[in-house]
Curated annotation (Swiss-Prot):
Record: residues binding Mg(2+) 1: E90, N536
Gene that produces this protein: purL
Compartment(s) where it occurs, according to its Swiss-Prot or TrEMBL record: Cytoplasm
The enzyme's E.C. designation: 6.3.5.3
Highest classification ranks of the organism: Bacteria, Pseudomonadati, Myxococcota, Myxococcia, Myxococcales
The name this protein goes by in its record: Phosphoribosylformylglycinamidine synthase subunit PurL
Keywords tagged on the record: ATP-binding, Cytoplasm, Ligase, Magnesium, Metal-binding, Nucleotide-binding, Purine biosynthesis
Length: 759
């Protein structure tokens, strides 16, 4: 007997009453429970982008290097000489909060599949992580679990994690963020897409068996958390990186044949989403025969088979007559493989089970016909008072040196060495610079010797405080800082991906934040010539009604040529000249200093002049390529004083356990406003450089040609950071505070009896 569809069942599936009414209108009848489950996942925010799609369409998505823009598993850009890069960033926020190790691990697995589904071999990963207040009882538990999950999966796959960012803020206490980025390399003329083309072609299942893990994961990722969060552990997928490694190699071998017509990762919403999306892109129908799906558990129902999010699975459309070729390659790699369906001309998506049709739905309402909302928007009501706050009324610290030490110990600013030492960043020997700098640089020579002179620069980042205080400007800052980081290693930005993390879009102030951030990213990308080629939206990042800071993470890719001429972020030689490319405004609105020293998150983010920003970047990029610089370091969180301190400290402790290496500096800074504002303000468009004295005149000439201001500050040398008239601190003391920031979080947690306290 068919189970009746009640309002309670509709609500359990995350559908609103008006959405269910639309389903009835599309079908002209009551859906079965299986069909309701299909609509539930396909109309979830995670799959349909129903609240965000109207805004995302405003992004610039085309350009001379774009080979594949948004809408596929990953974006693809042309690197020249017949080579291309596929890349994307994806969130796994909700699963990682519920079960941090598996949530983060399967997030890595999912983004790797997105990239190699395009025909690319993944060569590098990054991540952008957000955790709650360091003193919160759950923060260390999540930090340890997430980092272990990322390292555990990526290390087993043999894909190096070469960079990223980690930040802490109380708004993430109940909702951590795990944004995973992967880039792969492929021939520019061999891109594979997720389309069900060719009526009569077989639909084949490849990979791990299907179990009950992850059922309704997409729906869970489209809802707020509450007191029942711990009960949602069964919706978190379980990953097997060794199975994924076999799947990767099998797919890359299949791509060398003529057997693959289309291929799609079974990610969110599993077999349902992958098959529906392939049918939608191909403009065709699809018949699935669920009896043929390889199962890991007994007694699974069609509903469970279709909605399972078991990992390490692919759906491919093979050329008719090539089934045995696909089968032989997959069996060679010890993978399950089965023909489970056919492409049809019906325009309908059908699922068969034991001789009966258990779902028969038109494809269009599940894809392009899904709801699209123009939700109400209004500025956040707290902003006028925050903008009006008089920063000049704040007291100046009595000891600026002590303030700098405290700032360096803040986990957001502190060394991330504890994190990246758990990642195998040396595997495949692609890294041209070690983790800890402004941008990661990977060589292409390991995979393609003919391209030995080329490298790729990678950067991820965003400042959530800036985006809260001014979403439009904050989002522009995210793009500008990623581009600045790439300029610091001599790279030319070419494209971005994004991961847009926000709270509940049904709240007008959250929807306004989202729309303004999208507008800011779009305008900045147009200015830098960096189209948006892929991305992800993660909404409902709220717990008990408390939302996260708006966090539109940007991941940028740049071309470094020649890769031998890249640059590091730390001072190198005593006697080198230190200079600031940019100006000194002392803008502390939304800064880490304001929060750390005064407990305030107020004011406006620093002004951003895109013409000035581009001039600063062009100056440094050309100087790096000309070999003029010893170091280049972006001034961001913590301002100029933190940038100077970081430049004094090595990012790697010697493996023999000897005293860490560092070098001091002595500088004289003009103070147009209060000293603390100049030292710790996070003014935009600034890069701190060091260079041999003999290169100084050429560098100043270059800056003048590019239209960028340069301020000569002082020289590298000694064992103290000395800022005349402001502070003098031993670099050893700075390094001790900086290196201990994150270990201190873990020690604090160990001191609590309830280290893994429930939510």
């Amino acid at each position: 007997m068919t189970e009746p569809i009640t309002p309670e069942i509709v609500a359990q599936h995350g559908l609103k009453p008006d959405e269910y009414q639309r389903i009835l209108e599309h079908l002209g009848r009551t859906p079965t429970l299986t069909e309701l489950g299909v609509f539930s996942v396909m109309w979830s925010e995670h799959c349909s982008y129903k609240s965000s799609r109207v805004h995302l369409k405003t992004f610039p998505t085309s350009g001379p290097r774009v080979l594949q823009g948004p809408g596929e598993n990953a974006g693809v850009v042309d690197l020249g000489d017949g080579l291309a890069a596929a890349f994307k960033m994806e969130s796994h926020n909700h699963p990682s909060y519920i079960e941090p190790y598996q949530g983060a691990a399967t997030g890595v697995g999912g983004i790797l599949r997105d990239v190699f589904t395009m025909g690319a071999r993944p060569i590098a990963s990054l991540n952008a992580l957000r955790f709650g207040d360091p003193s919160h009882p759950r923060t260390a538990y999540l930090l340890e679990g997430v980092v272990a999950g990322i390292g555990g999966y990526g290390n087993c796959m043999g894909v190096p994690t070469v960079g990223g960012e980690v930040a802490f803020h109380p708004s993430y206490n109940g909702n951590c963020l795990v944004n995973a980025f992967t880039l792969g390399i492929l021939p520019a003329d061999k891109i594979f897409r997720g389309t069900a083309a060719g009526v009569g072609n077989p639909v084949m299942y490849v990979g791990a068996k299907t179990g009950r893990d992850g059922i309704h994961g997409a729906t869970m990722a489209s809802a707020e958390f509450d007191a029942s969060t711990e009960e949602k552990r069964p919706t978190v997928q379980v990953g097997d990186p060794f199975m994924e490694k076999l799947l990767l190699e099998a797919c890359l071998e299949l791509f060398q044949t003529d057997a693959v017509v289309g291929i799609q990762d079974m990610g969110a919403a599993g077999l349902t989403s992958s098959s529906v999306e392939m049918a939608g892109r191909g403009g065709n129908g699809l018949d699935l025969f669920l009896d043929q799906v390889p199962l890991r558990e007994e007694g699974m129902t069609p509903y469970e088979i279709l909605l399972s999010e078991s990992q390490e699975r692919m759906l491919l459309v093979a050329a008719e007559g090539k089934e045995e070729l696909v089968r032989s390659i997959c069996e060679k790699w010890d993978l399950d493989v089965a023909v489970i369906g056919r492409v049809t001309a019906s325009g309908r998506w059908r699922a068969h089970w034991r001789g009966a049709v258990v779902a028969d739905l038109p494809v269009d309402p599940l894809t392009e016909g899904a709801p699209k909302y123009h939700r109400p928007m209004t500025p956040h009501p707290a902003l006028p008072a925050l903008h009006a706050f008089d920063l000049a009324t704040l007291p100046e610290p009595a000891d600026l040196g002590a303030a700098l030490v405290r700032l360096l110990a803040r986990p957001t600013i502190a060394s991330k060495e504890w994190v990246y030492r758990q990642y195998d960043h040396m595997v495949r020997l692609v890294g041209a610079v070690r983790p800890g700098g402004d941008a990661a640089v990977v060589r292409l020579a390991v995979s393609h010797d003919a391209h030995a002179h080329k490298g790729i620069a990678l950067s991820v980042g965003v400042n959530g405080r800036f985006c809260f205080l001014d979403p439009y400007l904050g989002a522009m800052h995210a793009v500008a800082e990623c581009a600045r980081n790439i300029a610091c290693v001599g790279g030319e930005p070419i494209a971005i991906t994004d991961c847009l993390n926000f709270g509940n879009p049904e709240k007008p102030e959250i929807m306004w934040q989202f729309a303004e951030c999208v507008r800011g990213i779009g305008d900045a990308c147009r200015a830098f010539g960096t189209p948006v080629v892929s991305g992800n939206v993660s909404l409902y990042n709220e717990t008990e009604g408390q939302g996260i800071l708006p966090t539109p993470t940007v991941g940028m890719v740049g071309l470094v040529e020649p890769v031998e001429r890249t640059c590091h972020s730390t001072f190198r030689d005593a006697g080198d000249v230190i200079a600031l490319v940019g100006s000194l405004q002392g803008e502390v609105g939304g800064s880490e200093y304001l929060s750390a020293e005064h407990g305030k998150e107020a004011g406006r983010p620093p002004a951003l002049d895109l013409a000035r920003e581009k001039a600063v970047q062009e100056t440094v990029r050309r100087a790096v390529r000309a070999g003029l610089l010893s170091s280049a370091h972006d001034c961001s969180e913590g301002g100029l004083a933190v940038a100077l301190a970081e430049s004094c400290m090595m990012h790697e402790v010697p493996s023999d356990g000897s005293k860490p290496a560092w070098i001091g500096c002595a500088v004289r800074i003009p103070f147009p406003v209060r000293k603390d504002f100049v030292l710790f303000g996070e003014d935009a468009s600034r890069i701190l450089v060091s260079l041999p004295k003999e290169n100084a005149a050429r560098f100043v000439d270059l800056a003048q040609q590019c239209g960028a201001p340069v301020i000569r500050l002082g020289a590298v040398g000694g064992d103290r950071l000395e800022i005349q008239g402001a502070l003098s601190v031993p670099v050893e003391e700075l390094a001790r505070a900086w290196r201990d920031g994150i270990p201190a979080v873990l020690r604090r947690d160990a001191a609590h009896a309830g280290a893994t306290a429930p939510v």
